[in-house]
Amino acid sequence: MPWPSRKRDKGAVADKKEPDAKIAKTEEETEDKEEEEKSTKPPAGSSKSGLKNWKKAKESDSGGEESKITYCHWLLKSEPESRLEKGVDVKFSIEDLKAQPNQTTFWEGVRNYQARNFLRAMKLGQQAFFYHSNCKEPGIVGIVKIVKEAYPDHTQFDQKDPHYDSSSRKENPKWSMVDVQFVRMTKRFIPLSEIKTHHLAHKADGGPLKNMMLFSRQRLSIQPLTQEEFDFVLSLEEEKPH
């Protein structure tokens, strides 16, 4: 099936209403480079125990440890407003998804190791929140489902694509993507600010959102959700906006 050209973030993005989470692109690239080096080279002068720990960390980076965890639901961030990256507009809103053939598309362009591992852990039929990010009012706008589990992201091999990775090889691809299909819009827009209010209350007094990754790992564009987190956030669509 032919797909129109559209791109998302690199897998790590901060929302405009969370300035403390913003990290310069060069710093983000440095972090990913350091993470890659850690996954391929053992520390110099490692003891036997140190080498053993490094091997465990390497398994985790390659998806070994995290991908074994069964998550029920997900949160996928995408940018609804135009932004050029290497001359290509990376805008992709939920309306863009609805306009795709069969309201289905591949979720490509993730270039963060932890986000990639979460993609690889996704199972057929699991649902995810579609989250508008890096915009004036970030938040949840709809629900999608996984219709194809992780497979190699073709954009890593396309030199004209902003997410091209010259270090990736077709015989051992670094990056993966999944296919997602539109399920429905949420009954109302659920803003980040409202979710954060509940997160802070639950963090203080206990509740399903106390450990929500949306606030502990703000930069990740692919995030897991527990059943309790998903159910609570979804219940907010029934309430009047604060």
From Swiss-Prot:
Tissue-by-tissue expression: Expressed at high levels in bursa of fabricus, thymus and spleen. Also found in the liver, intestine, heart and brain.
Q: What are the entry keywords?
A: Nucleus, Phosphoprotein
State the superkingdom. Answer: Eukaryota
Q: Where is the composition biased (Basic and acidic residues)?
A: 10-27
- Pfam families per UniProt: EVE
Motif Nuclear localization signal location, chain numbering? 6-10
Subcellular location, in the record's words? Nucleus
Q: Which GO terms describe its cellular component?
A: nucleus
Q: How is it modified after translation?
A: Undergoes proteolytic processing during lymphocyte apoptosis.
Report the InterPro entries cross-referenced here.
Answer: 5hmC_binding (IPR052181), EVE_domain (IPR002740), PUA-like_sf (IPR015947), THYN1-like_EVE (IPR047197)
Q: What does this protein do?
A: Specifically binds 5-hydroxymethylcytosine (5hmC), suggesting that it acts as a specific reader of 5hmC.
**UniProt protein name:** Thymocyte nuclear protein 1
From which source organism is this entry? Gallus gallus
Give the source lineage, highest ranks first: Eukaryota, Metazoa, Chordata, Craniata, Vertebrata
